Amino acid sequence: MGTNGGRPTKLSLVPLPKGSVLLPGATLRIPVSNRPDLANLLSSLLDRTNAIRRDANSITFGCVPLCSPYLSKDGQHVIDNGTVDEDKKEEFESLEAGQARKEDLYRYGTLGKVIGVQRRAYSEPHLLVQGVQRLTVRRVLRERPFFEAECILHDEKETPLNDRETAELFQQLRQLSRELLTLLRYTSLIPNTGGPRLSPLIARKFELIITKSDLAQAGRLADVMADIAESGLEDKLRVLAAFDVKTRLERVVDILNKQNQIIRGSVKFTTISTDNIPPASVLDISQIDPRIRDLLSRRGIPGASGTPPPGLGGRNNEADEKESNELDELQQRLKDAQLSPEAQKVADKEMRRLRKMMPVNQEYGVIRTYLENLADIPWTKVTEDKLGPETLKAARKQLDDDHYGLEKIKKRLLEYLAVLRLKQSTNQGLEQQISILTKELDNSGGDIEKDIPSLPESDRAAIESKLNALTSKRTVDKSPILLLVGPPGTGKTSLARSVATALGRKFHRISLGGVRDEAEIRGHRRTYVAAMPGVIVNGLKKVGVANPVFLLDEIDKIGGPNFQGDPSAAMLEVLDPEQNHTFVDHYINIPIDLSKVLFIATANSLDTIPAPLLDRMETIQLSGYTTVEKRHIAKRHLLPKQIRANGLSDGQVVLSDDVIDKTTTSYTRESGVRNLERELGSICRYKAVQFADATDSAKLESYNPVVTVDDLEEILGIERFDEEIAEKHGRPGVVTGLVAYSTGGQGSILFIEVADMPGSGRVQLTGKLGDVLKESVEVALTWVKAHSFELGLTSDPNEDIMKNRSLHVHCPSGAIPKDGPSAGLAHTIGLISLFSGKAVPPKLAMTGEVSLRGRVMPVGGIKEKLIGALRAGVTTVLLPHQNRKDVKDVPEEVSNGLEIIYVKHIWEAIRHIWPDAHWPGQHHMDFVESRL
């Protein structure tokens, strides 16, 4: 049927497939299969048509889309406030065009003209329909066997040529249309983009439509572009309902904007553009298949080779303008960073290269990343050290609050602070004098207007000489490089953080454990793909200042020489105070000043640290915590921390010193306090359960916060380590020695038992003894055999005390390995006690190495041994005379609770052990020597 420009007309209607919309000027393929209504409609239309005019082009009917539940009743507005009925959603999802009812039809449609039938191989036939003009469905007359309705056909309204807003919308539509076509063409060249594609022939056809369209045809162009763009059903229905040209232009412009943004989001774009690409659209040519790109380049397509097209200059669109602004920002960042002269020279050179380079160039990203790294390095920015009269006092308090003991490291750090403060005071005085002399030198030329005469040349030279002398006296702060060596869990890492807090500086931790590649320290050279600076430069970038505190954790576990280089050798320059002011990272390749960085390294052992690296660091030994120190640490730090961590409050868990000591000695054996903290956590959790039960049962008064020693077995289980206790009665051949555990921090007593039996002089050693300990038994036996006559053990100087006798030396706790020379004195006294039949006092313990001449030589672990002796009930201790200095480190309560006797020779020890006994050779003590 024909059009009537607004008068009601009876039309046959075809419901379009779900999601399809036919716009005027567009073409739509309607599947014929499973559409009985369409077959009945075509049959009826053909019967009505005269035989002479019977062809496909004469068949017209109304094409009405299915209505979306997301549109308002008038079809003009999208419902996006969440009020859409769920039943309507489900009904729409399951709706098919062949079973549509009149309620399912949209209010507006398009008069369609059949232009042909299409059928491809192995596919169902389709009816090709072209949109002619818009229509409004006024009233449905019947639904079966096909729809018929009373409709109003609408002619295209004239575009207001003098409306400025409409003209601007039309220009925007043309620009966005060109952009969409260009993006579709280029995305067709890129594999696996998943986006819409457009053949060159069809794209060329649409380009001609865009070019030839003028303002009078704005509505027609809007319909064409709305059909091309991939948009939602609701958007296209709103375009169909837009009879006003201006409204239609606004809606189509929104659709094109969304479509272009979606394509840009799926493909990486750069500043490459061509004459056919509008300024807002750019594409990364490198994404196109190389063979296609080469073909495009040979055919002369601009921009396909990766270079900007002639006349564009690469700086004529929004992306380029944004890129230019970013480069200006980078230039400002480099300026604000106050680079060193050498770094500034390199940065200026690279920035000039960058500005001349297209972003598509592979070097562009490399250079830009390099410059960004240069800008991030703190070349001159430092944390101001606020060193005043209260600095040392505040730093000492900070260190004491965070850590108990560790006096050596605290002393060294306070020394560094004091030196830093004195240097700062000296420099301030020099700066004042330099300022005065500089001012005098500036005024030495005189002032004619003020009638000030100039200084003689000799006076000027004197001022310059004095100024140079003062300048040379400026002190430069070179931070020390400290190495904290000690067992695990002794607070080395946390101490470094506490140092940073005390100094008021930023802190950064670098874990060197397991580092095998030299490039991790010094960075990769820029020639490598994805090269970046090493951990030192990255640390500076992270803290943002040139004088932080760097913790080099586990430096003893850094890798040695391998095919990737030597990481430990790379640390030589970093940790050398004479070289690290010109440290060169392979990536930056410019000297960086590390002299202001306070390096604190930690290690568990010195054995694996290369000698050249160890020589560059100031080593501070940290021994394990003693039981007394662990008690203080537990009371001040660990217990309050665990109480809070387990949801309790202060006072809800109370542990006495005896409970803490029992937990330390019977449930842990370590140098640090990590396991002690775990055990205290178990106690707190046990009390937390009791407190929760009391609270839930409203019997809070029954809760007892005190933990006793008897409760520990129920809370922590059976004791894991047995503590040796001094015996009450002495017996010949049994001596109490002293031992310091290899884990560090703890000591105890060790019984040495010697027994004899008939035999051939053989000596049997048991108790899992090490080689050094076995040798000390041999030395002790040799000395006793050599001096048996002086000791009154034999009646004849030539008699062998071991004749017809064998010995067995045993150290209890046979499962625990034992080694070291410190039991030499105890072995000697044990042999003398056995052979003489005199018992050693049970409350007396001893330690010391013995030489063949009978000298008692110094040993280690004195502090731990004395604490263990006091805890075991020992009252008197024999120590080597040369260990007198080590007793100064012993806590006062320990030294006051023990009688410490220093001996130089075995004869001295014998005299103190058995003061009432008479030894035949005692008068020879000062000059007796070996008979060997």
Swiss-Prot record:
BP GO terms, sorted: protein import into peroxisome matrix; protein processing; protein quality control for misfolded or incompletely synthesized proteins; protein targeting to peroxisome
Sequence segments annotated as region (Disordered): 298-328
Location(s), subcellular: Peroxisome matrix
Class of this enzyme: hydrolase
Positions of the catalytic residues: S822, K865
InterPro entries given in the database record: AAA+_ATPase, ATPase_AAA_core, Lon_bac/euk-typ, Lon_lid, Lon_proteolytic, Lon_Prtase, Lon_prtase_N, Lon_prtase_N_sf
Reactions it catalyzes: Hydrolysis of proteins in presence of ATP
A cellular-component GO term for this protein: peroxisomal matrix
UniProt-listed Enzyme Commission number(s): 3.4.21.53
Residue span, Lon proteolytic domain: 729-916
Keyword Cytoplasm set for record: no
Source domain of life: Eukaryota
Basic and acidic residues compositional bias, start-end: 317-328
GO MF: ATP binding; ATP hydrolysis activity; ATP-dependent peptidase activity; serine-type endopeptidase activity
Short sequence motif named Microbody targeting signal, residue ranges: 930-932
Sequence ranges assigned to domain Lon N-terminal in this UniProt record: 11-260
Function, in words: ATP-dependent serine protease that mediates the selective degradation of misfolded and unassembled polypeptides in the peroxisomal matrix. Necessary for type 2 peroxisome targeting signal (PTS2)-containing protein processing and facilitates peroxisome matrix protein import.
The protein's name in its UniProt record: Lon protease homolog 2, peroxisomal
Organism: Emericella nidulans (strain FGSC A4 / ATCC 38163 / CBS 112.46 / NRRL 194 / M139) (Aspergillus nidulans)
